[in-house]
Amino acid sequence: MDRMDSSDEEIDNISDDELQSGDEIEVESSNSPLRLNYILGNEIGRGAFSIVREATSRATGTKVAIKSINTRFIKNKLLMREIEIMKKVGDHPNILKLYEVYETTKHLHLVLELVTGGELFDKIVQRGEYSEQDASKIVRQIVSAVGHLHANGIAHRDLKPQNLLCAGEEGDDIRVADFGLSKIFGDGDYLETCCGSPEYVAPEVLECKPYDKACDLWSVGVITYVLLTGCFPFWDKNNAVLYEKIRNVDYGWPEGLEVSNEAKDLVSHLIEKNPEKRFTFEQCLIHPWVTGEGVSNARKIKPFQQQQPNNR
């Protein structure tokens, strides 16, 4: 389902998913600073206005990813904000690192940490099955990254599986990515932009009420539910019906699916309509299911079955 971007604040980002033909992104000339410092390799990804290539540092031999963005289509202020945020929080082990930025008249080249495992849920599907212990480890890393963002005055606002990358082939070393909708805020500040991906967005955002960083913890709750069940807690082909289910927190657990009480307890404190009652990242990090102490490791989860939850 498409992302929602509507408000008093114009939204754009540098992480578009779909390819558009037309304006190709030219690689800089051989004597450009970028080429002098990096050996460019194969294309490994492409967005509407960007190309990602694998590259190697001439100085250190380190493998990196270089994202080249055609700035003709991107609002410079928002792009600069995304870069500022990535520089500010990239010292966390579970946040995708931005090493350098090269700017020309037509393009921005972002030198990024190279992650080779792909998107989190694609990796899980490849594995075929996993345990609550595996899910707990993944959620623990996501919450740790979210905590680092919040401690630095940043709300991500678009946490979803597509923005969770695997650093390696095993799929258990997570990086939070895509800060195109992220926002810097101060203590006591509220946000107003209605944005995010519908299945993962908090009810206060849908209702266009002032909201804060607690919206990210709702998204963590939805991600956790999907990890545990293989389906969304809120789902309908009709957006209006979907939004109503989210506003009413109308969800249940699939019949016949064994989920530990500790896991259900965590989800219930994250998928909580009142943001003031919703768990903070600090509360999540000490929850028994997140620490691993209250995790059931007996049941193997088969991800992404076609079943839908038994909504109450």
Swiss-Prot record:
Alphabetized InterPro entries for the sequence: Kinase-like_dom_sf, Prot_kinase_dom, Protein_kinase_ATP_BS, Ser/Thr_kinase_AS
Family, as annotated: Belongs to the protein kinase superfamily. CAMK Ser/Thr protein kinase family. CaMK subfamily.
Binding site for ATP: I44, G45, R46, G47, A48, F49, S50, I51, V52, K67
Name recorded for this polypeptide: Probable myosin light chain kinase DDB_G0282429
Activity regulation summary: Does not have a calmodulin-binding domain.
Limits of the Protein kinase domain: 38-290
Molecular-function GO terms, alphabetical: ATP binding; myosin light chain kinase activity; protein serine/threonine kinase activity
EC number: 2.7.11.18
Key words, A-Z: ATP-binding, Kinase, Nucleotide-binding, Phosphoprotein, Serine/threonine-protein kinase, Transferase
GO term, biological process aspect, one: signal transduction
Compositionally biased region (Acidic residues): 7-27
Disordered as annotated region, ranges: 1-28
Active site: D158
First-tier enzyme category under EC: transferase
Catalytic activity, reaction form: L-seryl-[myosin light chain] + ATP = O-phospho-L-seryl-[myosin light chain] + ADP + H(+); L-threonyl-[myosin light chain] + ATP = O-phospho-L-threonyl-[myosin light chain] + ADP + H(+)
Domain of life of the organism encoding this protein: Eukaryota
GO cellular component: cytoplasm
Biological role: May phosphorylate a specific serine in the N-terminus of a myosin light chain.
